[in-house]
Structure formats: structure tokens, C-alpha cells
């Protein structure tokens, strides 16, 4: 029943390095713990989606990113919240990846997607990636 629920705006980064893209494993103690996802998080009040993504990448991975165009937007209903996830094409412009929040981080090829258990909100995005739509 989505009609009476507040939508939580969430942003994430699709970061490529040659033919691999970055995924992050959620900490065990958080909701959807140990599932894989794209780096990102909630948009704070007064922030643009792009500002939120830059902040989240800094907080979670200690890197600065440039935010490009929207790769895809999905609306997903979890039992505990309704999210609108906006995934941006992004690139690391400075800093070295550090795991400041996640359990693990990996660079994977598209054909490796089935080897990882992802957050349900990412499923349609992953399908688009597997169809070869960069």
C-alpha cells in the first residue's frame, strides 16, 4: 500500500573502472545487512540529489566524485520504507577507496552480478546493466 507512505529519496552512484563497476556490502547490523548495493544513501533536507551523493561517497568511501546524468530511477517498497532510488553515472575524481561504513567493496563485471545477493531495490537496475545498457 504505497499511497499513504512517505517516499524516502535515496541516491546511489554507478561508478565504472574500465569494464567493472563498484558495489558495496552493507554492514551486518543495518537493515538489509550483508546485501550488496551501490554506494549512496538518503537525501537530507535542503540537499540536492547530487549534493547528497557527493556527501555519501565522501562519508562511506573517502572519495570525491563527479556526478553525471541519471542512469535509472526506481520506486521500491520495503516492509519498513518506500524508497525512490536515483542512480547516477558517477566517477571518482580524487581519493583512495576506504571502507568507512561497508563490510566489503568490490569491482565486478556485469556477468558477475548473479554471484552477489543485492538489495531488492537494485534488481531492475541490475537487469538493465545485464541487458547491456550503460
Name the predicted role of every residue range.
Residues 2-22, 42:
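Conserved N-terminal beta-strand and adjoining loop/helix that marks the start
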Residues 49-57, 70, 88, 105, ...:
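Hydrophobic packing within well-folded, soluble alpha/beta domains
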Residues 60-67:
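Short secondary-structure junctions
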Residues 15-16, 23, 90-92, 107:
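Conserved hydrophobic "DFG−1" position in protein kinase catalytic cores
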Residues 64, 72-96, 106, 129:
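Active-site-adjacent beta-strand/loop module that shapes the phosphate/pyrophosphate-binding cleft
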Residues 89, 98-129:
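NUDIX/MutT-family hydrolases
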Residues 20-59:
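Conserved Nudix-box catalytic region and its N-terminal flanking loop in Nudix hydrolases
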